[in-house]
């Protein structure tokens, strides 16, 4: 199981960061939990009203993240892809990962990849931030996005 070596999430002060979250609706219980975790971290960091956009599946996430990256300081991508019996899993995971990376680099905007790519539904549930989950990948993605946005801001305005 994942979770070993996870760093402590820093206390973030991101009150003036504009944040967007794009989350799929496929595997609703898991995606809703990921979204809840991301929203909690955002609120703790002072981001009270992030833009939230829901899409059907993971493959739609990168293009919506691209639109959001044009108008926000950070974007969080949330979803889940569970391996099936065909190569479709590999194609979707690769397309989503490459798409999100490209959006982040092209827009110079952090896009945190909180899209779970797992072999089983139980693995996804264990990472979704539910009461019995070992991890909260939605919360971790939010911390990564906000932390990176603040780092980029510091780099852009040297002391």
Swiss-Prot record:
Its EC number is 2.5.1.78. This is 6,7-dimethyl-8-ribityllumazine synthase. It is an enzyme of class 2 (transferase). Catalyzes the formation of 6,7-dimethyl-8-ribityllumazine by condensation of 5-amino-6-(D-ribitylamino)uracil with 3,4-dihydroxy-2-butanone 4-phosphate. This is the penultimate step in the biosynthesis of riboflavin. PANTHER family: 6,7-DIMETHYL-8-RIBITYLLUMAZINE SYNTHASE, 6,7-DIMETHYL-8-RIBITYLLUMAZINE SYNTHASE DMRL SYNTHASE LUMAZINE SYNTHASE. It comes from the Bacteria. Pathway: Cofactor biosynthesis; riboflavin biosynthesis; riboflavin from 2-hydroxy-3-oxobutyl phosphate and 5-amino-6-(D-ribitylamino)uracil: step 1/2. It catalyses: (2S)-2-hydroxy-3-oxobutyl phosphate + 5-amino-6-(D-ribitylamino)uracil = 6,7-dimethyl-8-(1-D-ribityl)lumazine + phosphate + 2 H2O + H(+). 5-amino-6-(D-ribitylamino)uracil binds at residues 26, 58-60, 80-82, 113. It comes from Mycolicibacterium gilvum (strain PYR-GCK) (Mycobacterium gilvum (strain PYR-GCK)). The active site is at residue 88. Disulfide bonds: none annotated. Belongs to the DMRL synthase family. Keywords: Riboflavin biosynthesis, Transferase. InterPro entries: LS, LS/RS, LS/RS_sf. GO terms for molecular function: 6,7-dimethyl-8-ribityllumazine synthase activity. Homopentamer. GO terms for biological process: riboflavin biosynthetic process. Signal peptide: none annotated. The keyword Transferase applies. GO terms for cellular component: cytosol; riboflavin synthase complex. (2S)-2-hydroxy-3-oxobutyl phosphate binds at residues 85-86, 127.
